[in-house]
Amino acid sequence: VPREYEVYDFTPVQHPADDPNSNIITTHFAFSYLHDTILKLDELGHDIPTKYKYLERFSNTNVMDVKMNDPTVYELFLSTKPLGVSPEEIDCNIGTFGIPEFGTRFSMKMLEEAKPKSFADLLQISGLSHGTDVWTGNAQDLIRDGICDISHVIGCRDNIMNDLIAWGLENALAFKIMESVRKGRGLTPEWETEMKAHNVPDWYIASCKKIKYMFPKAHAAAYVMSAIRLAWYKIYIPIAFYCSMFTVAPNGFDASIAMKGKQFVVDTIKDIEARNQRKEASPKEVSSISTLQLINECYARKIRFLPIDIEKSHSFMFLPENGAIRLPFSSLPGLGENAAANIISAREESPFFS
């Protein structure tokens, strides 16, 4: 906000959830309301570099040495086979739980339908999952109807310019059309005429007209490279993978649940999902589902959890120990970070005798 203005000059005050009886007043609005009024900075936090750090620490490897062309890694985006488990054991047809950008139910459904087989296909998936009106009612229908496959739908904004140039349109016009489509402004009648004159398929033109926002390919590439690296560890050094995931993003990891075995974890997931359908589950419980799915996957892969040990457990790190995962003090429900750190400090001063 410029120094000479107040935020209230741009955001009329409102009550949360438009409740006039609330005593709280906020200036929080959807960013689209202010999109053309003030500059918005997207300062996003990323935990991937932190996960890299722990992967290297727990495995004594370098994440940058992971190859981008391992066929087994790509198989993970199509089935559970690389994990050595059946779909029934983890309640999922593919093995991407815990893989950033590819581990949500939405993106997993896309993977199942699109069946990506290469890095380029995964770029398409990443672009489709981050765009607006690009997948649902658009690329998804084209794939379902057999009109084209994942390799040929419009996945990232760069595709439009490159495709149009390949069809023979002038570079400058191809760029202009890409910019208009990616911003949701569609096509002019003149552009449509030019595209048809160069034999651009009708389905492609129709797809362009539906798009509201498109993801850039370079951004998608960064996400896919991270996903490939993490998928490699998940397959080949699973203990390091799970320890890193739980350490960096525990998402309510509860030792009292994890230590009760696979069936109890499965029952807990089903209970939360059932209550969430009835709008009875808390946001904290819902956010813990992704962690519970990984815990269940550990059990399916015969990876054990070791109980909290006063001498061996870390305050917050999940540690590899003889092919198993040693739980930290922070995984105890109700034990805060400071209390966990204090236990470690006391242990370092002198051993516990009782």
Task: Give the role of each language-model region.
Residues 1-354:
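Noncatalytic, beta-rich nucleic-acid-contacting surfaces in large DNA/RNA-processing enzymes
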